[in-house]
Amino acid sequence: MSVWFTIPSARPVEEAEKVLKLWRQQGYKIALWRDAEGDMQPGVYDVMMVDLSVSYPGYAKAVNALITEVVGRDPSAEWFVIGGDDTEPDPSHTAEEIARDLSAEFYNRTPFQDWKRWSTFGVMQPTGDRFAGGSIDRIAGSAWIGREFARRINQGNGPLWPEYHHMFVDEELQNVAIKYGCFWQRPDLIQLHRHFMRANEKTTSEAVVKPIPEHLVKWNTPEHWKESKLIFNTRKANGFPGSEPLP
């Protein structure tokens, strides 16, 4: 069994490495999507993909590509954790400990008797970090995604709906997992999100106005928010068409 932290990373190398080190220490393998080739030190990641296109494909497409790549390379990969290079792993549980809990839980939730197929058809979001008034309760922003969920949901086109570039992709993920009865929130797990608007390191930290990091400016505009919200609201009103899982 292996668990992979699968994220795009745009932070300066030295900043990203501080976070990636924590994930590796807890037993995770790491797959990164970077915008520039050759700027990460060897040993920091297990799989690295580089954006060679004219523009960044967006968070959803990047994560989907990473998960697809890992599934093809690592038959032991059972769970994938999304988020960002500002998200830390739960410090009190190893990757394997959490993964075993999840596989047992999701297997018990289904009437099907096929362990390999259904024990990883699920999404789990740690909610112990109560940043910004517990905003994590409505989004699967640093979720654990099971191998079979990733392979089957959205008609086999990846776990994240590809229309989203940054905002609302995590809210759709949560809603879709709820729709198919395979979503679990765990307040006992803390994956601290060092959001740029975080006031302090307490799990109850409020959000305060701060300058937007350069690599996030493009995705934190009113225009992008409005565009993404329209996609989400339209899809939600129609029952998230195309989200159906493969049999």
Regions found by a protein language model. Give the residues of each.
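Conserved nucleotide-sugar donor-binding
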Residues: 141-156
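Short alpha-helix within the catalytic core of nucleotide-sugar-dependent glycosyltransferases
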Residues: 91-112, 151, 169-170
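Short beta-strand-to-loop element that shapes/binds the nucleotide-sugar donor at the catalytic cleft/hinge
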Residues: 109-141
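C-terminal catalytic/acceptor-binding lobe
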Residues: 12, 165-247
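Short beta-strand-to-loop acidic/aromatic patch adjacent to the donor-nucleotide binding site
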Residues: 76-90
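Active-site-proximal specificity loops/subdomain of glycosyltransferases
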Residues: 35-77
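A conserved hydrophobic helix/loop-capping motif in glycosyltransferases and polysaccharide synthases
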Residues: 3-15, 33
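Short, well-formed alpha-helical segments that are part of the catalytic scaffolds
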Residues: 11-26
